[in-house]
Amino acid sequence: MTKPNGKTAFVTGSTDGVGRVVAKRLAEQGWRVLVHGRDQGRGHALLAEIAAAGGIAEFLPADLSSLVEVRGLANTVTEKTGRLDLLINNAGLGTGGPRAIRQTSADGYELRFAVNYLAGFVLTHLLLPLIKGSAPARIVNVSSVGQEAIDFDDVMLTRGYSGLRAYRQSKLAQILFTIDLARALADSGITANALHPATYMDTAMVRQSGVTPISSVDQGAAAILRLAVSPELDGRTGLFFNGQQEARADAQAYDAEARQRLKALSFKLGGLSANEYAAL
């Protein structure tokens, strides 16, 4: 049996693709891993693999396109564990390919914005008290080099929609959030960073987008794990990485006014209360 290290990690979107590999690797390193996904069969299959290798994991199902389920997921995490040393917001939707049509979440928001960005924003804020109580701790947001400036006049892309545009906007939103969060948590012992794990990994999401994979999920997992556990990242925060190299994101990520606009909008859309806002 793998020797437990006493730490707990929560990885969203970890029943498939790169998240699955990350969850397994963390379990191999002695982490207690909270696994998340929508598919019960995949979730329990992963638990069986981790248990067979001597690791410890639990499966927490939830559909991140529903903020009711996002809140339920946060409550479940809080009930399951008294500490959270690592949060990896990995769950997401791809571009949907060239024929993608505009879809909305259970709450009426553009689907990729809701799942790729807003769900992680809300989940992170709801889990902050738990994370703060476990400091030093890390938050890793899995983003992309595919980024497009947010149009604050049409965030939900009701005009000129494309799946690619929606995906790129949601991924940049993650980075604005990461930088803002890192600054808010300065001197708390919690770091927040974002990354593009690898280009066109061999995952179902990439293949469904009509793209030929050119990278392996192991490459992407290695980049995520470096941000998650490497001692060389101790104290480094508010950064964006392309693979394992620090990089510059789209210019909007470094615009303080844009970050504030997104934050205010996200608290409103996410239905976060003043007390939840004060968790920062």
Regions found by a protein language model. Give the residues of each.
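Canonical Rossmann dinucleotide-binding motif of NAD(H)/NADP(H)-dependent dehydrogenases/reductases
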Residues: T2-L34
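Conserved glycine-rich Rossmann-like NAD(P)H-binding loop of the short-chain dehydrogenase/reductase
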Residues: Q29-A45
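The beta1-alpha1 cofactor-binding region of Rossmann-like NAD(H)/NADP(H)-dependent oxidoreductases
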Residues: Q40-G41, L60-N75
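A short, exposed helix-loop element centered on a Lys and neighboring polar residues
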Residues: T124-H125, I179
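C-terminal helical subdomain
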Residues: V211-A264, K268, L272, Y277
